[in-house]
Amino acid sequence: MESIEQQLTELRTTLRHHEYLYHVMDAPEIPDAEYDRLMRELRELETKHPELITPDSPTQRVGAAPLAAFSQIRHEVPMLSLDNVFDEESFLAFNKRVQDRLKSNEKVTWCCELKLDGLAVSILYENGVLVSAATRGDGTTGEDITSNVRTILAIPLKLHGENIPARLEVRGEVFLPQAGFEKINEDARRTGGKVFANPRNAAAGSLRQLDPRITAKRPLTFFCYGVGVLEGSELPDTHLGRLLQFKKWGLPVSDRVTLCESAEEVLVFYHKVEEDRPTLGFDIDGVVIKVNSLAQQEQLGFVARAPRWAVAFKFPAQEQMTFVRDVEFQVGRTGAITPVARLEPVHVAGVLVSNATLHNADEIERLGLRIGDKVVIRRAGDVIPQVVNVVLSERPEDSREVVFPTHCPVCGSDVERVEGEAVARCTGGLICGAQRKESLKHFVSRRAMDVDGMGDKIIDQLVEKEYVHTPADLFKLTAGKLTGLERMGPKSAQNVVNALEKAKETTFARFLYALGIREVGEATAAGLAAYFGTLEALEAASIEELQKVPDVGIVVASHVHNFFAEESNRNVISELLAEGVHWPAPIVINAEEIDSPFAGKTVVLTGSLSQMSRDDAKARLVELGAKVAGSVSKKTDLVIAGEAAGSKLAKAQELGIEVIDEAEMLRLLGS
């Protein structure tokens, strides 16, 4: 069994390691709750054995050393931390200690605030002008982040109003709203940049940039919650009064600050904020409870690292540690393949979590995740639990690499991942069980095969009863089988069969659109049909040949090529043709022989038309030898702009492409 000295040494070493990762490297390896637990364990041992307390123990200081890359600023008034409580019993004990220490019948009013999950900073104003800003650092010395703080729009560079002190040091939290955090990570995933585990890390990473121009691009904000240095003026004698004065001078203060007249009211505030937490739009990890009276604060004083008149009442942790037992792959309704971590069940924010999303192969690589790893799980609000980082220092020897599938785990079709896209997808859109309902609903829709009377509820039942597996099975349905569906009498069933029979006669463009090839909309389908003319020619086309079609680039060409390369898709198409699906033979139009101003031109329609439908306009243009594309590019010859034309019109003007309105189009069609 370890001696007390050994236990203390091990705890202090572990805490120092994690303080370094958190404060210096901005790369925490464990959640806050685990750090708090280790600190409580150390404090309890030191309380029982005060003779073993050392000056360098983590309990005897506030934080960690500042980053060496920044110059340092010494705090004239130390920036202390707060003690924490984690349950009602502990808070009520804190309340009693305050009442007992005051030794009077004087009532205590509490000022309650949100405990923001960001980076604590101090900002010094001289004669109302911002002159410096620093991080907390070790509580005595912080990093000089003046240039970066000046880029935060919420922080005034000059205070306004009356009676502004000659020197005023305000303290508060710089943080990143959730919407901004999500955008930063979205951009990082797209460009291959650093992805942050949570908004707090993103805020710290943004504020500790050596180049202020990078900080300026991050949507950081700030709430003020206290004061350090004060010279040349007086402030109100209550904490809330001071916050309201700061607000008058132009400093942002949270609108959730609330006065509570009793411990019971504090508990009501705590639970109300906990309930509202998912809708705030930014991360908090508890509430801060402060004695409102400055006179009472002075009476209560401080301990070594924290005031006796304030406490942080923390919420149940949103992050916990557990082990990855396996990684499985789910297929979504659009064919997207998502890796899911199967976890050793753990309670996170009051919910038992056994699964967590891993997003995609890039995310697994970024995390360096292996099966068997110890990981940190985060669950914020209603967000699906996710793995935020791996505890590499505790990786087991028998951990296994995660192997991303090359074939769909549902149908066995090839997995496609287009260059530049993070998501891998199943190419078996016509046979994949995971995509079945959505692909069938698309196939029968009005702009595709246009099967009258076959709505979503009928498709749902057909799939659930396993009457239909592929689009070809639709044309094998009988009235007798359909009458087995809910609310489907003999007459309605026969109407559906008749509609299916009618739908067999279609166009090549509609048929291509109905197949649901990724990113092949109506315009692209029409372009492919017009260019290749026959299904056989399209199936045999290379990626290079496909890119010759107007509006088709490398990405769409890859999707089309991969779709027809999948044997299961070709088999379903053969079945559809065998069931009688057909379209007229192509009419070869030689643009040179057509006397029309549109002949041989690539045309784009944008905005709404008042004199004819867009479909009719497309049909007339194709008849007159035009190629109708869905987007504007350098290949575009002409843009027809209807009412409320948007980005396509702007791009055409930017590229110097000819633009005409609907009236001119009608005149030219008539000519």
From Swiss-Prot:
InterPro entries in UniProt: BRCT_dom, BRCT_dom_sf, DisA/LigA_HHH, DNA_ligase, DNA_ligase_AS, DNA_ligase_CS, DNAligase_adenylation, DNAligase_N
Q: Which SUPFAM superfamilies match?
A: BRCT domain (SSF52113), DNA ligase/mRNA capping enzyme, catalytic domain (SSF56091), Nucleic acid-binding proteins (SSF50249), RuvA domain 2-like (SSF47781)
Please name the Pfam families in this protein's record: BRCT, DNA_ligase_aden, DNA_ligase_OB, DNA_ligase_ZBD, HHH_2, HHH_5, Nlig-Ia
Keyword field: DNA damage, DNA repair, DNA replication, Ligase, Magnesium, Manganese, Metal-binding, NAD, Zinc
Required cofactor names: Mg(2+); Mn(2+)
The record places domain BRCT at: 593-671
Q: What class of enzyme is it?
A: ligase
What does the entry list as the binding residues for Zn(2+)?
A: C408, C411, C426, C432
- Binding positions for NAD(+) per the UniProt entry: D32, A33, E34, Y35, D36, S81, L82, E113, R136, E173, K290, K314
Q: Which residues form a coiled coil?
A: none
Which SMART domains did the record assign? Answer: BRCT (SM00292), HhH1 (SM00278), LIGANc (SM00532)
Q: Please report which protein family the annotation says this sequence is part of.
A: Belongs to the NAD-dependent DNA ligase family. LigA subfamily.
Give the function comment from the record: DNA ligase that catalyzes the formation of phosphodiester linkages between 5'-phosphoryl and 3'-hydroxyl groups in double-stranded DNA using NAD as a coenzyme and as the energy source for the reaction. It is essential for DNA replication and repair of damaged DNA.
Q: What is this protein called?
A: DNA ligase
